[in-house]
From Swiss-Prot:
The keyword Ribonucleoprotein does not apply. GO terms for cellular component: cytoplasm. Catalyzes the NADPH-dependent reduction of N-acetyl-5-glutamyl phosphate to yield N-acetyl-L-glutamate 5-semialdehyde. GO terms for biological process: L-arginine biosynthetic process. This is N-acetyl-gamma-glutamyl-phosphate reductase. It catalyses: N-acetyl-L-glutamate 5-semialdehyde + phosphate + NADP(+) = N-acetyl-L-glutamyl 5-phosphate + NADPH + H(+). It comes from Halorhodospira halophila (strain DSM 244 / SL1) (Ectothiorhodospira halophila (strain DSM 244 / SL1)). Transmembrane segments: none annotated. It is found in: Cytoplasm.
Amino acid sequence: MIEVGIVGGTGYTGMELLRLVARHPKLRLAEITSRAEAGTRVDELVPALEGAVDNVFTAPDTERLSRCDVVFFATPNGIAMESAPALLEAGCRVIDLGADFRLRDPAVWTEWYGMSHSCPELLEEAVYGLPEANRDALPGARLVANPGCYPTAVALGLLPLLEAGALADGPVVADCKSGVSGAGRAAKVATLFCEANEGFKAYGASGHRHLPEIEQTLARVAGAPVDVTFVPHLVPMTRGMQATLHVVVDRPLDELEALYRQRYADEPFVHLVASGGHPETRWVRGTNHCRIGLHQPPGRPDRAVILSVIDNLTKGAAGQAVQNLNRMFGLEETAGLEGLAYVP
């Protein structure tokens, strides 16, 4: 069994990690940390895990964590980079679900996250953990930067176009919507029920932290800069994410569909819906799947609208982290991630 540690187990992402690790056939939860809940049984805080997890939260301790084979960081930005060097030195692998190792340029990190990077020497080594685009770099990796939720939905929606050079010159617009769990579990006025329910709003329109990550990811695939207009929105649902992508293309819809079907034919978690279909977030709820729909506006053969839906907590965070772990340790990529959404 692979010994797993989770740093930050009380947020929504950490709780989703707990759920996935608990049911994984090859993982054993060795350490689960929380400064605020140290000494509390996990199943007292998360009753849904009673009978599956009998661990007790402990305060973060590098020496204890270093005995694990791999440690997940489900922590606020800036935490993982303080602990990762010591864990790596001890031979422990690290998967960071935060943003500490996603951006290659430390100056760009500082610009968007407002703090200096404490271990910029590790940025080049960190593997960007989007398996569908970077699968071969994951086996044996010591340090993996788990992608953000919005970058995941956008990248999966555009990968086939970029790889085939089918994206023509013109604007790329990423109009994205997320459930409220994407804002985290900490109490904030904007995410109180009476504030978020029966409302719909954009945020970060003048600059969101996921923008440089999106552009960096797309540029890596395209081999050239890709300028993106990215506007996220908050919708009154708990979990789920949709990226509606408006692009200029060089081929008709039937050729685009053939391109996407061929590209994702062997991907266990990415699926193109039936021609003319509109994927829904509830179709992927609680799963590691992404479902994609393709459309072309009438009379505009040079335009395409791509619909990409994921669960922000699973494929957008914890599920993708487990998928990365599976690749790192030579397991079946789908291990512990089987299952479809529950509907209705």
